[in-house]
Swiss-Prot record:
The lineage of its organism: Bacteria, Pseudomonadati, Pseudomonadota, Gammaproteobacteria, Enterobacterales. This is UDP-3-O-acyl-N-acetylglucosamine deacetylase. Zn(2+) binds at residues 79, 238, 242. GO terms for cellular component: membrane. Pathway: Glycolipid biosynthesis; lipid IV(A) biosynthesis; lipid IV(A) from (3R)-3-hydroxytetradecanoyl-[acyl-carrier-protein] and UDP-N-acetyl-alpha-D-glucosamine: step 2/6. Pfam families: LpxC. It comes from the Bacteria. The keyword Transferase does not apply. It comes from Citrobacter koseri (strain ATCC BAA-895 / CDC 4225-83 / SGSC4696). Belongs to the LpxC family.
Length: 305
């Protein structure tokens, strides 16, 4: 059978919090089968757990948060969640000694390296996928996102930013998902923001960790980072990275075709909640062997070496 995945060993890294600008220690721990993805704040006494759950997601101006019933939150979970989706990690406990996951370089790549360093372990329990059975679409003005049935996982994302630096690059990106494709084509794409917004937020004591080290920064005309872009179309690739993380908030890889126009964290989450709320639109599936498994989810040699 296709088995659930966790880590082989505990790994740790430090980074800076996007909101506070303070050092954050991140610890990734293996977890038993059917634990799911658990985010944990160890700066609170007692520590507070936040299971990845579409209904717990709140979209703020700067990031995605998970919020519990007592209104306690953990922030900036989206890029790490994308790395978990990319490598198909089903069970993990993610600890931080702060209210937020460190921003690292603004992409998912540092988290991918950390997960690969921990090693991927297979558990003796069937991996559950969410398979889309009916088309589900959500809209917000001219923005929309939808899932259609498809035996694999494809993503097709279009952005529409009126900016010289972004107009010059492609505003649409489509891919057949796989762990290899995610690592090579998506994981290194960084988040982006306007210099004037960062300066304004920092003047109000917000976004204190925001810098050229953790984002693509643009003014009204150009990219300000000395090293430029990692991809010509890094902006739309990062929006796809965000979507992969947002859609994995159900804790399972999804089998279906995702298409979006001008979508963001809030609309991606609205789509996920709409799918899960419509019982006839999806089902849990497991696979007995590799031959049945959609190509998208076959483990690359780098992951299970």
């Amino acid at each position: 059978m296709i088995k659930q995945r966790t880590l082989k060993r505990i790994v740790q890294a430090t980074g800076v919090g996007l909101h506070t600008g303070k050092k954050v220690t991140l610890t990734l721990r293996p977890a038993p089968a059917n634990t799911g993805v658990i985010y944990r704040r160890t700066d609170l006494n007692p520590p507070v757990d936040f299971p990845a759950d579409a209904k717990s997601v709140r979209d703020t101006m700067l990031c995605t948060c998970l919020v519990n019933e007592h209104d306690v939150r953990i922030s900036t979970v989206e890029h790490l969640n994308a790395a978990l989706a990319g490598l198909g990690i089903d069970n993990i406990v993610i600890e931080v000694d702060a209210p937020e996951i460190p921003i690292m370089d603004g992409s998912a790549a540092p988290f991918v390296y950390l997960l690969l360093d921990a090693g991927i372990d297979e558990l003796n329990c069937a991996k559950k996928f969410v398979r889309i059975k009916e088309t589900v679409r959500v809209e917000d003005g001219d923005k929309w996102a939808e899932f259609k049935p498809y035996n694999g996982f494809t993503l097709d994302f279009t952005i529409d930013f009126n900016h010289p630096a972004i107009d010059s690059s492609s505003q649409r990106y489509a891919m057949n998902f796989s762990a290899d494709a995610f690592m090579r084509q998506i994981s290194r794409a960084r988040t982006f923001g306007f210099m004037r917004d960062i300066e304004y937020l920092q003047s109000r004591g917000l976004c204190l960790g925001g810098s050229f080290d953790c984002a693509i920064v643009v003014d009204d005309y150009r990219v300000l980072n000395e090293d430029g872009l990692r991809f010509e179309d890094e902006f739309v690739r990062h929006k796809m990275l965000d979507a992969i993380g947002d859609l994995f908030m159900c804790g399972h890889n999804i089998i279906g075709a995702f298409t979006a126009y001008k979508s963001g964290h809030a609309l991606n989450n609205k789509l996920l909640q709409a799918v899960l709320a419509k019982q006839e639109a999806w089902e849990y599936v497991t696979f007995q062997d590799d031959a049945e498994l959609p190509l998208a989810f076959k483990a690359p040699s780098t992951v299970l070496a």
